[in-house]
Amino acid sequence: MDYPFILKKAWEGYDASKTIRDIEDISAMVSTNHVFKITFDDDDIVIAKLSHFGKYEYFKEDHRIIHSLCNNLLYPFENVLSKSLLKNNRVYIYRHRQGKDDAWVVFYNPTRIAERMPRRLDEHHIITLGQQIGKFHKACSRVKNVLPK
């Protein structure tokens, strides 16, 4: 599957006025998704997620829910999830079908990170991380009533 070709077609469908200069694979290699950093000629950057596992309808539904969650989380978690790019007030999702290939792309604004965690966590960091993840899950459960069904 030609990922750069698919990403370029996806971007053309979103905003053909901007030209892609570079596509860098930044995937964590821990899932079936492929994640790319896209840099444009004007140095703007977006993140693209490409998937070809599962069903398009589920991918689309998942990203509608993620977008709603992202926009409804309150402080201090309002910037934890990346914001999807919208077109016509909807999450823009590109579907590529060619032969046996069926892949989907969604674009995100990059999330800013003030400080990265150490590569190896000591016990204090592990406890703090666990507490923050617990608080994040509680914040997510508080917005469940406003998420799409």
Stretches with model-predicted labels:
Residues 1-25:
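Juxta-kinase regulatory segment immediately upstream of eukaryotic protein kinase catalytic domains
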Residues 18-41:
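ATP-binding glycine-rich phosphate-binding loop
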Residues 119-149:
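A cross-family kinase active-site recognition segment
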